[in-house]
Amino acid sequence: MPELPEVETVKRGLAPAIEGALLVRAELRRPDLRFPFPENFAAAVSGRRILALSRRAKYLMIDLEGGDVIVAHLGMSGSFRIEAGAQPAAPGEFHHPRGKDEKHDHVIFHLDGGSGQMRVIYNDPRRFGFMDLARRDTIAEHAYFRDLGEEPTGNALDAAYLAARLAGKSQPLKTALLDQRTIAGLGNIYVCEALWRSGLSPNRAAGTLVDKRGRPKQALLALVEAIRAVIADAIAAGGSSLKDHIQADGSLGYFQHAFSVYDRAGEACRKPGCDGTVTRIVQAGRSTFHCPRCQK
């Protein structure tokens, strides 16, 4: 599943092409994806100008004139591609498996932009993605967003914030960090990497990073720095291309080449001076990769 850096890459690829364009017509080729489309969805968004494309956690938000927002989630295999004239482009494309079968083109947005007419096509073989319609003035209270934690890309994520969220928690640290109510958009790959960088065990009780007065310990300060750095590095690299991600220009992201522990079970730990071996365990149904020797 695409995580925050991959969705951010999609946003950055799509935005220059669609912002300011007129959404002439929305074409739905089936009544549902993971969930049914909202009633009269196609009619509600057609004829509206696209004001902005943004991201919150792992959601894309397409702001339309009039105050409506198309909320899109890519699920496991969703992709957006742009076809302009006879020359297809692939901004923000995700794919599973690599390549596209047009029978999985479920939504087509027909646009008229500054460079002419184009089609923005949503392709999703597994149909775990979805689209919904919300109002911008109440979107913070929407069920998708109201319980989300702070983003790992902004200044609001600091040690004091995370200490308040983790204080008293006995659950494993990795499990606590994957809770979207703690940090929005943070997923499995980047939690593993951040824990390795900060030298913290995924099995450690989350509350042990907070002192009795509720203040962050030094280990929590290091963790916050690692989370922010890992996410920034991944965005700069265009995300991680395992089987799900390709960049806006059709090239692959390359952060997976910088993985220190994720998907490296059995390899020597890359931390200088550590002679440990990367180990894979399962936590809450997900693979966790860590070095038991240097992560405490």
Curated annotation (Swiss-Prot):
GO molecular function: 8-oxo-7,8-dihydroguanine DNA N-glycosylase activity; class I DNA-(apurinic or apyrimidinic site) endonuclease activity; damaged DNA binding; zinc ion binding
CDD domains assigned to the protein according to its UniProt record, in alphabetical order: EcFpg-like_N (cd08966)
Coiled coil: none
Record GO biological process: base-excision repair
Protein name, entry field: Formamidopyrimidine-DNA glycosylase
Oligomer status and interactors: Monomer.
Role noted for this protein: Involved in base excision repair of DNA damaged by oxidation or by mutagenic agents. Acts as a DNA glycosylase that recognizes and removes damaged bases. Has a preference for oxidized purines, such as 7,8-dihydro-8-oxoguanine (8-oxoG). Has AP (apurinic/apyrimidinic) lyase activity and introduces nicks in the DNA strand. Cleaves the DNA backbone by beta-delta elimination to generate a single-strand break at the site of the removed base with both 3'- and 5'-phosphates.
Pfam families, alphabetized: Fapy_DNA_glyco, H2TH, zf-FPG_IleRS
HAMAP family per record: Fapy_DNA_glycosyl
